């Protein structure tokens, strides 16, 4: 199941840097984190769903690249985001 419009808007409102912000690194990472957590729970139930597992790995790689970019450009924003999302880094 894809992320619902309401849930996505809720995440965007929480992590947006300004009004109408949908593309900042923080918003993208927050949405990806929600999707990754959702797919992770699906994989635990359906262990042989290899197509979903591949999609999960792609999303994890995308999030990793975005976090690396944020760490290079602004360490303080990176640390705040990691802490608010509860990611291990």
UniProtKB/Swiss-Prot annotation:
CDD domains found in the cross-reference section: Ribosomal_S15p_S13e
Keywords: Ribonucleoprotein, Ribosomal protein, RNA-binding, rRNA-binding
One GO CC term on file: cytosolic small ribosomal subunit
Gene3D superfamilies reported in the protein's UniProt record: 6.10.250.3130, S15/NS1, RNA-binding
Keyword rRNA-binding included in the entry's annotation: yes
PANTHER family: RIBOSOMAL PROTEIN S15, BACTERIAL AND ORGANELLAR, SMALL RIBOSOMAL SUBUNIT PROTEIN US15M
The protein's assembly and partners: Part of the 30S ribosomal subunit. Forms a bridge to the 50S subunit in the 70S ribosome, contacting the 23S rRNA.
Alphabetical list of NCBIfam families matching this protein: S15_bact (TIGR00952)
Protein name, as recorded: Small ribosomal subunit protein uS15
Organism, as annotated: Streptococcus pyogenes serotype M5 (strain Manfredo)
Gene it is expressed from: rpsO
């Amino acid at each position: 199941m894809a992320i619902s419009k309401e849930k996505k808007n809720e995440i965007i409102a929480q992590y947006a840097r300004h009004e109408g912000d949908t593309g900042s690194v923080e918003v993208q990472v927050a949405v990806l984190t929600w999707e990754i957590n959702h797919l992770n729970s699906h994989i635990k139930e359906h262990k042989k769903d290899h197509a979903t597992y591949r999609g999960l790995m792609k999303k994890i790689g995308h999030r990793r690249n975005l976090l690396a970019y944020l760490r290079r450009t602004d360490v303080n924003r990176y640390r705040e985001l990691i802490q608010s999302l509860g990611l291990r880094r």
